[in-house]
UniProtKB/Swiss-Prot annotation:
GO annotation, biological process: cap-dependent translational initiation; formation of cytoplasmic translation initiation complex; translational initiation
Pfam family, one: eIF-3_zeta
Domain text: The RNA gate region regulates mRNA cap recognition to prevent promiscuous mRNA-binding before assembly of eif3d into the full eukaryotic translation initiation factor 3 (eIF-3) complex.
Biological role stated in the UniProt entry: mRNA cap-binding component of the eukaryotic translation initiation factor 3 (eIF-3) complex, which is involved in protein synthesis of a specialized repertoire of mRNAs and, together with other initiation factors, stimulates binding of mRNA and methionyl-tRNAi to the 40S ribosome. The eIF-3 complex specifically targets and initiates translation of a subset of mRNAs involved in cell proliferation. In the eIF-3 complex, eif3d specifically recognizes and binds the 7-methylguanosine cap of a subset of mRNAs.
Biased composition (Gly residues): 109-144
Superkingdom of origin organism: Eukaryota
Localization per Swiss-Prot or TrEMBL: Cytoplasm
Official protein name in the record: Eukaryotic translation initiation factor 3 subunit D
Organism this protein belongs to: Phaeosphaeria nodorum (strain SN15 / ATCC MYA-4574 / FGSC 10173)
Main location: cytoplasm
Assembly behavior: Component of the eukaryotic translation initiation factor 3 (eIF-3) complex.
Length: 575
C-alpha cells in the first residue's frame, strides 16, 4: 500500500473542527478577528491560555470583584488614562502620587520653561506657561505604597494609607484688605509661575546714608542657651519710624532727579521678593505716576507685623477655629513678636556718645521739637539696583530704602561692620501651633542647629524676608536673638536666651533662598504695572490659595479711609 501524502491527510480532517480557541461571532468584525481596545489601556498579553473567565486568582475569593480586577478588560485602566476627561468639580481634591524616583536636579528655565531674565544674553525663555495638574510627589517612606486615589490598603514598612482622613478641610483665612466692588482684576499669577522667574542683579550701589548707629554689646553673644546668659527683656522708649515709600522725602527728591524708575522700602520689597513663601494674606499698593512706580504699604497694614509659625504644618489656630488660648492665637502672637522686635534691638546696643557712629546726613524723620523720646539706633541706606535687560530701550533702576540697626568693630582689621538685629520668640512648645519646636531653654546650648532648622521650617517666610532685607542693606552680619516667655501662660514678660550670628548670604543659602527669583518677581510685577495706564493698583495675596491678584483701584482708595479715621476722634470729642 502506497504511503498517504500530507495533502491527503489534511483533506481527510473534519471541516468543522479546528485547532485553538473556538471562533465566536462576538470577537469578529466583518469576518476579521477583533478585540476591543482603549488607548488608555496598557498593552498586555496577546493571549492568556491559563486564565479562564470563571477562574479565581490564587484561590482568593473575589468578593464582588473588589480585590481582583482584570486589567485586560476594555477601559479598565481609565484612572491613568491621560485622555480621560476629569470633572471640573473634582479637580480641587484630585491628587496623583507617583512611585518613580525623581531627580533632585531641576530643569533650567530654557525653551518653554517660564521667563528667564539674563543681562547680556537677553531673555532666553518664553512667557511662563500655566502648568497642568500633572505634578507628582514622592510620598511616604520605603516600602510599598498604594496609588489608588481611594486609599487602598496600607503600604509596607514606612508606607501609609492615603484616604479620606487626609482630606482635612482647608482653613478659610480672611484677606488682608477688603476687595471693593469697583476694583477691577487686571492679572492673576499663581506661585508656580512666579517660582520659574529669574533675574541676575548685582549687589547695588549706595546713594545716600542717613541717621546714626550705636555699637553692639558683644556680651549678648556669650554662650547662647546657657542659664548664666539669660537676661530679662526690658522695654525702652525710643522714637522709631516706619515711613512708607510715598511719604519718604528722600525718595521723593531722588524721584524728582530721575535717579530711578521704581521706588520702594526694604519692608515692602522683601515681601514681594519672598511672595512664594507666604501663607497669610498681604497687600501692596502700586502707584504709577508717569514713568515712575512707587510701591507702598497701607497704614495699619499687616506688613508691619511679625508673623509667628506662619509656615508650620499646623499653624496657630484662630479663636473662632477652636483655639482656647487667646494669647496663642495668630493675632496675639503677631502683636507679641512685633513688640519683641521693636525693643530687642534697642537693648543689645551700648547707648553713649562715645559708642556712636554718625552717617553722612542726619536722621531724615526725627524732629527734636516734636519728639519727647530720643531716637532709636537706626541708619538708612538708600541703594540703587539695576533691573535692566539687554532688550530694554531704556535702563530700569530701582531705589530702595534699607535699614541697619547697629555697628561692631571687626576683631581682625578693626573696621566697622554693619548689623541688622532681629529676634525669634518662643511662646509654648507644647501648645497647638508650636510646629514641633524644641524647648529652647534645654536645647539651645546643645542643639542650636536643630533649633534653628525647626525655626527655618516653621517661619521660612519671615526669616527669608529678614535675610533679604539684610542683603539689600549690604549688612555684614545678621544678629538673630532668641527670646522666650518667662512663663508660657504670660505673654508680657520675656527673657533673652541668647544671640546667634550669621552672614546674610550664608543664611539665605541655608534656607535655599533664591535671590534671582525674587528679583525676577519684582521685574515681572513692575512690567505689568508699566504696561497699564497711570493710576493706582493693589497687589493682594489670596488668603486661601497660592495666588496673587493685581487690582486696578480708584485713585483715592485708602485715602478716604484715612480721612474718616481722622474725623472720627473729632466727632467723639464734640459729643
Amino acid at each position: 500500500m502506497a504511503p498517504a501524502s500530507l495533502l491527503d491527510l489534511v483533506s481527510a480532517l473534519p471541516a468543522t473542527e479546528s485547532w485553538g480557541p473556538a471562533v465566536s461571532d462576538e470577537t469578529m468584525l466583518d469576518g476579521v478577528p477583533f478585540a476591543p481596545y482603549s488607548k488608555g489601556d496598557k498593552l498586555g498579553r496577546m493571549a492568556d491560555w491559563t486564565e479562564g473567565k470563571d477562574r479565581e486568582r490564587g484561590g482568593r475569593q473575589q468578593y464582588g470583584n473588589r480585590n481582583y480586577r482584570d486589567q485586560q478588560v476594555y477601559g479598565a485602566n481609565q484612572q491613568t488614562n491621560p485622555f480621560a476627561i476629569q470633572a471640573a468639580e473634582e479637580e480641587a481634591t484630585f491628587s496623583v502620587v507617583d512611585n518613580t524616583r525623581t531627580s533632585t536636579r531641576t530643569r533650567g528655565f530654557g525653551r518653554g520653561g517660564g521667563t528667564v531674565f539674563g543681562r547680556g544674553r537677553g531673555q532666553r525663555g518664553g512667557q511662563a506657561q500655566r502648568g497642568g495638574r500633572g505634578t507628582f510627589q514622592r510620598v511616604g517612606g520605603r516600602g510599598g505604597q498604594q496609588y489608588d486615589s481611594r486609599g487602598g490598603r496600607g503600604g509596607g514598612r514606612g508606607g501609609r494609607r492615603f484616604g479620606w482622613r487626609d482630606d482635612k478641610p482647608q482653613r478659610n483665612r480672611d484677606a488682608s484688605v477688603q476687595v471693593k466692588p469697583e476694583w477691577t482684576v487686571m492679572e492673576e499669577i499663581d506661585f508656580s509661575r512666579l517660582g520659574k522667574l529669574n533675574l541676575d542683579t548685582g549687589d547695588g550701589e549706595d546713594l545716600e546714608n542717613y541717621g546714626f548707629l550705636y555699637y553692639y554689646d558683644r556680651s549678648y553673644d556669650k554662650q547662647p542657651g546657657a542659664k548664666t546668659s539669660e537676661r530679662r527683656l526690658n522695654v525702652l522708649e525710643r522714637a522709631a519710624y516706619n515711613v512708607t515709600t510715598s511719604s519718604d522725602p528722600i525718595l521723593q527728591e531722588l524721584s524728582d532727579k530721575d535717579e530711578a524708575t521704581v521706588f520702594a522700602t526694604d519692608n515692602v520689597l522683601s515681601m514681594l521678593m519672598c511672595a512664594t513663601k507666604s501663607v497669610y494674606s498681604w497687600d501692596l499698593v502700586f502707584s504709577r505716576k508717569g514713568n515712575k512706580v512707587f510701591i507702598d504699604k497701607r497704614d495699619g497694614s499687616n506688613l508691619d507685623m511679625v508673623t509667628v509659625n506662619e509656615n508650620a504644618a499646623d499653624a496657630p489656630l484662630e479663636i473662632s477655629e477652636g483655639n482656647k488660648d487667646s494669647i496663642n492665637s495668630p493675632g496675639a502672637l503677631m502683636l507679641e513678636a512685633t513688640h519683641i522686635n521693636n525693643v530687642f534691638p534697642l537693648q543689645v546696643v551700648s547707648e553713649s556718645d562715645t559708642n556712636k557712629v554718625n552717617m553722612t546726613h542726619e536722621h531724615p524723620f526725627y524732629n527734636e521739637e516734636v519728639e519727647t523720646d530720643p531716637p532709636a539706633s537706626k541708619a538708612y541706606r538708600y541703594r540703587r539696583f539695576d533691573l535692566s535687560l539687554e532688550k530694554d530701550d531704556e535702563p530700569l533702576h530701582l531705589i530702595v530704602r534699607t535699614e541697619l540697626d547697629a555697628v561692631v568693630k571687626n576683631n581682625i582689621n578693626g573696621e566697622d561692620q554693619y548689623l541688622t538685629i532681629k529676634a525669634l520668640n518662643e511662646f509654648d512648645n507644647k501648645a497647638q501651633g508650636s510646629g514641633g519646636a524644641l524647648d529652647w531653654r534645654s536645647k539651645l546650648a546643645s542643639q542650636r542647629g536643630a533649633v534653628l532648622a525647626t525655626e527655618m521650617k516653621n517661619n521660612s517666610c519671615k526669616l527669608a524676608r529678614w535675610a533679604v532685607q539684610s542683603i539689600l542693606a549690604k549688612a555684614d552680619t545678621m544678629k538673630l536673638g532668641f527670646v522666650s516667655r518667662t512663663n508660657p501662660k504670660n505673654n508680657n514678660d520675656h527673657v533673652i536666651l541668647g544671640v546667634l550670628t550669621n552672614k546674610p548670604r550664608d543664611f539665605a543659602s541655608q534656607m535655599a533662598l533664591n535671590l534671582n527669583n525674587g528679583w525676577g518677581i519684582v521685574r515681572t510685577i513692575v512690567d505689568m504695572v508699566l504696561r497699564m495706564d497711570e493710576g493706582k493698583y493693589v497687589l493682594v495675596k489670596d488668603p486661601n490659595k497660592s495666588l496673587l491678584r493685581l487690582y486696578q483701584v480708584p485713585l483715592h482708595t485708602f485715602e478716604e479711609e484715612d480721612v474718616e479715621d481722622m474725623q472720627a476722634p473729632n466727632e467723639e470729642d464734640e459729643e
